[in-house]
């Protein structure tokens, strides 16, 4: 069995607003009891290269409702029936060109018609049927997808509430728009992330998030207590890359060797909302040959949190969070090596203070004037 962990104590990056992801505030409509106002959250994450094209990631949060039943006769004075909320839901519209007018985006949501169905293969799945989307998003990824199939636990808050024999519709309430550089849009193929080999060592990344919640809340029971008393701490892991095993028997492949590799990569971590809450990692230095497939040509990679921890990702739909710390961990890649070796931890992962919070750029995303009732 592995012995105790070897940790390299290094200073934590200075505190900054850029380490935070803010939750949407709850603003109720004055008319219509219990109705939330539609809102937009706007964020910019740029690579720093002026030649890099800008795009927008549009991510939506809302609620699944049963489709209203229609009667035989309908008059013009009939009011549209609003069915009760069944559960919360997230759906990404993907990447597309830069969008400008926030109020236009909110009004365009009335043109959305997305049906929801439950199915199963080896596990439960959700099928989104895209019947109609606003013309404003015609150049975004969702316009090319008539059907979107996904694991139910990643996109639906409480999939157990969806039952057979009921038609469901997805109603968008919150719109998260991230203006970013095109070079940031890179994810590692799942087969590469899942592959393990005795010929390499695996580099994992642990990000500690301070989640905004009350100590006596239900979600706090599944997290660690924050020693600073400012919320709860959640740990999420990603497979970052692989490093080739050194074969020089005269060299010590210890924490100093690993720290040197990480230091040369100059790793920086930030958080954004792209495919839902997403951790972004940038390698600004030398990337070893074995690690290059895990980054794009400009050293960026995105890791959606719902791929690693669906339950934590769903918590972040409605709760703010802050990056407390990030570490890289060197492990054996294959399970036999993993069980026999210690974890070597490198804690000097920078938090990008310009790309880890959600601030309004030139307008306030939380004004009521930029909101409409979620009809």
UniProtKB/Swiss-Prot annotation:
Domain of life, per lineage: Viruses
Keyword Transferase applies: no
Keyword Transport: no
Any one biological process term the GO annotation gives: virion assembly
Family matches, as Gene3D superfamilies: Viral matrix protein, C-terminal domain, Viral matrix protein, N-terminal domain
Key words of the record: Viral envelope protein, Viral matrix protein, Virion
Xref: InterPro entries: Matrix_C, Matrix_N, Matrix_Paramyxo_C, Matrix_Paramyxo_N
GO molecular function per UniProt: structural constituent of virion
Record localization: Virion
GO cellular component: viral envelope
Record function comment: The M protein has a crucial role in virus assembly and interacts with the RNP complex as well as with the viral membrane.
Family in the record: Belongs to the morbillivirus/respirovirus/rubulavirus M protein family.
Name assigned to this protein: Matrix protein
């Amino acid at each position: 069995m592995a012995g105790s962990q070897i940790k390299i104590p290094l200073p934590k990056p200075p505190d900054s607003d850029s380490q935070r992801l803010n939750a949407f505030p709850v603003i109720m409509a004055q008319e219509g009891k219990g109705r939330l106002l539609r809102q937009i959250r706007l964020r910019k994450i740029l690579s720093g290269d002026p030649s890099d094209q800008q795009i927008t990631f549009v991510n939506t949060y809302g609620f699944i409702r049963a489709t209203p039943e229609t009667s035989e006769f309908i008059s013009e004075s009939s009011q549209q029936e609003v069915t009760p909320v069944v559960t919360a839901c997230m759906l990404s519209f993907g990447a597309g060109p830069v969008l400008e007018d926030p109020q236009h985006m909110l009004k365009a949501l009335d043109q959305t018609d997305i049906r929801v169905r439950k199915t199963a293969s080896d596990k439960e799945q959700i099928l989104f049927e895209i019947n109609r989307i606003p013309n404003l998003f015609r150049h975004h990824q969702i316009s090319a997808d008539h059907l979107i199939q996904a694991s139910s636990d990643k996109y639906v808050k409480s999939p157990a509430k969806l039952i057979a024999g009921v038609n469901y519709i997805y109603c968008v309430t919150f719109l998260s728009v991230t203006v970013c550089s095109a070079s940031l849009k890179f994810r590692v193929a799942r087969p590469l992330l899942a592959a393990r080999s005795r010929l390499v060592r695996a580099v994992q990344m642990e990000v500690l998030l301070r989640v905004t919640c009350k100590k006596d809340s239900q979600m706090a029971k599944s997290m660690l207590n924050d020693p600073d008393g400012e919320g709860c701490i959640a740990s999420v892991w990603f497979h970052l890359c692989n490093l080739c095993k050194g074969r020089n028997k005269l060299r010590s492949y210890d924490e100093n060797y690993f720290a040197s590799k990480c230091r040369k990569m100059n790793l920086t971590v930030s958080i954004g909302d792209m495919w839902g809450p997403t951790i972004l990692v940038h390698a600004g230095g030398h990337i070893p040959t074995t690690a290059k497939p895990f980054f794009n040509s400009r050293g960026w990679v995105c890791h959606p949190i719902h791929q690693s921890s669906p339950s934590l990702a769903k918590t972040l739909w409605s709760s703010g969070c802050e990056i407390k710390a990030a570490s890289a961990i060197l492990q054996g890649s294959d399970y036999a090596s993993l069980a026999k070796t210690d974890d070597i931890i490198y804690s000097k992962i920078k938090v990008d203070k310009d790309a880890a919070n959600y601030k309004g750029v030139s307008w306030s995303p939380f004004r009521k004037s930029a909101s409409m009732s979620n009809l």
